[in-house]
């Protein structure tokens, strides 16, 4: 399990909390960001992470890249499903 609470940064600085829990991995992060009114080339272009939960004891920073976290969660999910052999392969891949 990997969840992050994404928050619209612009609205937050205006005093309004607009956000939602996002389960990772997610197939369409862009649509999820649009659902909290975060869009490229608009008044509200940025989101940040205000809370998180995961089974991996991974500390998530406020401004971590949501797309990178999504990729990480895909790998962690794969490792969890496939077992330690997959973990070895992922570590070997990271070293190269």
Predicted regions and their residues:
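N-terminal ordered "arm"
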Residues: 1-41
